A protein has these predicted regions:
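Acidic interaction surfaces
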Residues: 1-266
Length: 266
């Protein structure tokens, strides 16, 4: 837990124990399709495996008809025969060939998972064949990308915007997988006055975001947060502020005219 004290205020920043996937609560631009034997990752889908997914995306690009099926079967046979004894595996060669066709209609990025003392995800390889590997893709149709950013045809600049937005969504999901989710509680004179949860990302960046939700006069408290792991110290700080509040109330009571006190009591 991080804590900062300034005047009558005490700000506490701590992990959010109720983690909700950003894929469930946020509107997202890209669609994340993942396949893993132990974890349910990304967005929900009905594909049996990655081959089923790529096949459907391929047919969606060339056409879900007899001609499309024949083109698919012909492509698989040709690529398989060419790369059966080449440097690429036959499976990878077929995947690459399908993705090349799929790219005519969709913008895709690969998704890699690191599974070592926790989970992490990104769109580039972790270069760790033992504990990481590709688990799927995030994609968006070019049509939806044009609607999002405006424009009549896909350009390199628009493609980059689409890819960057999908990368940002993967980064948010990565924070969720890592458990990088936080919230704050703001106390005044020992009494909770404000709180907000669900901030995701690197803690330093999260604290800057939290400042936007704090009242004026408290925003700079995020710059003075310090690690505080002793519950007794935290409780002592809150009790100290509560005592100040009680003392202030007592002094106000002492200076209140007796007639007013009696009237208030009635």
């Amino acid at each position: 837990m991080l804590m900062a004290v300034e005047g009558p205020y005490a700000l506490m920043v701590q992990p959010d124990d109720i983690l909700i996937s950003p894929r469930e609560v946020d509107e997202h631009f890209g669609t994340m399709v993942c396949f893993h034997s132990r974890y349910a990752l990304g967005d929900s889908h009905n594909y049996m495996d990655k081959d089923d997914f790529l096949r459907e995306m391929y047919l969606d690009t060339v056409g879900h008809d007899e001609a499309g099926l024949k083109r698919y079967e012909h492509m698989v046979n040709i690529v398989s025969s060419r790369f059966r004894h080449g440097p690429k595996t036959e499976e990878q060669a077929v995947d690459d060939a399908m993705l090349k066709v799929i790219s005519e209609k969709y913008i895709t990025l690969p998704l890699y998972l690191m599974d070592h003392s926790g989970l992490a995800m990104q769109t580039t390889s972790f270069n760790d064949p033992w504990d990481s590997g590709q688990v799927g893709w995030i994609y968006v149709s070019k049509e939806d990308a044009l609607k999002e950013f405006g424009g009549e045809k896909m350009t390199g600049a628009l493609r980059k915007k689409a890819e960057d937005l999908m990368r940002s969504e993967v980064a948010a999901y990565d924070s969720y997988l890592r458990g990088e989710c936080y919230g704050f509680e703001l106390y005044k004179n020992g009494e909770l006055t404000d709180s907000c949860w669900g901030f995701m990302g690197d803690l330093a960046d999260v604290c800057k975001d939290m400042a936007e939700y704090l009242p004026e006069g408290c925003k700079d408290m995020v710059d003075h947060l310090e690690e505080q792991d002793h519950p007794a110290t935290i409780i002592k700080t809150l009790l100290k502020h509560a005592k100040i509040q009680v003392n202030q109330a007592a002094k106000a009571f002492e200076h209140t005219p007796r007639q007013q006190v009696i009237g208030d009591a009635r």
